[in-house]
């Protein structure tokens, strides 16, 4: 579970103006269809999508607050940042610094997902399975790494 954070704490860490009202969350979600009450919606943009188009939907579904880029209209539940991608990276780095467990990274051109599954299975046989985390699917890129750290 992600550390609990608020729009005010995040604004302070990112050297942004402190929002007047505080909203707290412990989960980052980037798909507005998967928002639960209290989640924080991070409006990412890509070549084929723009999370900013779904901010209203995320808030209607119960998002505690939204992180958007500054060029999007702001209100008390929307924290504007220079780049939502950089904010995602910042949150993942912040979470990683707080984690004190052992981390195993698997690299290479081929076989990463198979190796991850095998290693996870072996470690789960030897240790408490609830203490073993393996990223879902093939989250072996920037976004997968960030989302793994924030899960």
Predicted segment positions?
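N-terminal leader/targeting and accessory segments in enzymes
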Residues: 1-90, 94
